[in-house]
Amino acid sequence: MYDYIKGTLVKITAKHIVIETNGLGYIVTVANPYSFSDQMNQTIQVYLHQVIRDDAHLLFGFHTEDEKEVFLKLISVSGIGPTTALAIVAVDDNQGLVAAIDNSDIKYLMKFPKIGKKTAQQMVLDLAGKFAELPAETTNTTANQTAGNQQLDEAMEALLALGYKSTELKKVKAFFEDTNETAEQYIKSALKMLMK
């Protein structure tokens, strides 16, 4: 098991980042890869969780230990795998998640990709009262301003990778067409819209 990795950020894609350390490039799947845009070619530290399967060894990365803790609690719920947990972590609204779990708000929980009624109920059963020590937000990085349409396309790719449907994303993309923000800002805003 690994706690964290420290190395140079050398690549960002819609699904993951690549961190080079000691001559090896580690693929680390993260909730919002573009939140690392301002740290390209710099030394970064990312908290890790390793998943070992028969066909792959996967690394999931997080900005903070609190974000990792949310992820670990989510994957402890039957029916929630790492990809679904990342999609939930990506919303970056712990207060909404905690309130929904503590208040048994099944409808809110079902707005996350791949979360049906049964899984939402299981989340409430397994996690109610277990998030008391977590802060309101898990990440606090910002990205540099760049070309809007390319950034919007990258944000939509990342949301597709998290499991959102292209039909949902077309409506969201149309809303942002005339704006100029970073991919990270688009993702955060889009996730808030999708959760309404």
Swiss-Prot record:
Annotated Gene Ontology cellular component terms: cytoplasm; Holliday junction helicase complex; Holliday junction resolvase complex
GO biological process: DNA recombination; DNA repair
Location(s) in or outside the cell: Cytoplasm
Coiled coil: none
One Gene Ontology term of the molecular function aspect: four-way junction DNA binding
SMART domains associated with the record: HhH1
Region (Domain II): 64-142
Region Domain I, annotated ranges: 1-63
UniProt keyword list: Cytoplasm, DNA damage, DNA recombination, DNA repair, DNA-binding
CDD domains: UBA_RuvA_C
Chain residue ranges for the region called Flexible linker: 143-146
Region of interest called Domain III, as start-end residue ranges on this chain: 147-196
Disulfide-bond pairs as recorded: none
Top-level taxonomic group: Bacteria
Stretch forming the signal peptide: none
NCBIfam families in the cross-refs: ruvA
Its biological purpose: The RuvA-RuvB-RuvC complex processes Holliday junction (HJ) DNA during genetic recombination and DNA repair, while the RuvA-RuvB complex plays an important role in the rescue of blocked DNA replication forks via replication fork reversal (RFR). RuvA specifically binds to HJ cruciform DNA, conferring on it an open structure. The RuvB hexamer acts as an ATP-dependent pump, pulling dsDNA into and through the RuvAB complex. HJ branch migration allows RuvC to scan DNA until it finds its consensus sequence, where it cleaves and resolves the cruciform DNA.
Assembly and binders: Homotetramer. Forms an RuvA(8)-RuvB(12)-Holliday junction (HJ) complex. HJ DNA is sandwiched between 2 RuvA tetramers; dsDNA enters through RuvA and exits via RuvB. An RuvB hexamer assembles on each DNA strand where it exits the tetramer. Each RuvB hexamer is contacted by two RuvA subunits (via domain III) on 2 adjacent RuvB subunits; this complex drives branch migration. In the full resolvosome a probable DNA-RuvA(4)-RuvB(12)-RuvC(2) complex forms which resolves the HJ.
Entry's family note: Belongs to the RuvA family.
Domain comment as written in the entry: Has three domains with a flexible linker between the domains II and III and assumes an 'L' shape. Domain III is highly mobile and contacts RuvB.
Protein name: Holliday junction branch migration complex subunit RuvA
